[in-house]
Regions:
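An N-terminal assembly and electron-transfer interface module characteristic of large anaerobic redox
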Residues: 1-153
Length: 153
């Protein structure tokens, strides 16, 4: 696990989604950037350690979701909200398992990364918007309230 919780500061549970078909390097890069930006802004965060999943800490499987839920439960008194970031399509079942099993009852924000028009080959394609639709649909089905970003990604 990696925890950078800061007493007296808002702390977020972070979920970085990925899916086997897509390039997990995109997820690794977004994870690094998101953690750095939260630290710069003075926020704390709780996220699976890079060694805990096959994709360097990104959420891909149901088992990853179980690990994440356990981690979030351990830090439930420090987590003020959950940020789900989708660098690519993401695997919604792992993400939903993490949030539902953690039972934190905190705000959930879902964000997806844009595709770049000149980078839609197999190594660079994100298709995160479609993943966001799937994740949000599952959150809705599970009765988990969430906030969507103003723009589609």
């Amino acid at each position: 696990m990696y925890v950078a919780a800061k007493p007296g500061k808002e702390t977020f549970g972070l979920i970085i989604g990925t899916r086997a078909y897509f390039n997990s390097a995109l997820a690794i890069d977004v994870r690094k950037t998101l953690c750095e930006e939260l630290e710069k802004a003075g926020y704390g965060y709780v996220i699976l350690d890079v060694a805990e999943t096959l994709t360097d800490g990104a959420m891909e499987t149901v088992e990853d979701g179980r690990k994440c839920a356990k981690l979030f439960r351990e830090y439930r008194d420090q987590i003020d909200g959950i940020i789900v970031s989708l660098p690519n399509f993401g695997f919604e079942v792992g993400i939903i398992n993490a949030i539902a099993r953690a039972e934190l009852n905190v705000p959930v924000l879902v964000q997806a990364c844009d595709d770049e028009n000149d980078k839609v080959d197999l190594d660079s394609r994100r298709d995160a918007f479609c993943g966001k639709i799937s994740v949000c649909n599952n959150l809705y089905q599970y009765g988990i309230p969430f906030t969507d970003t103003e723009l589609h990604t």
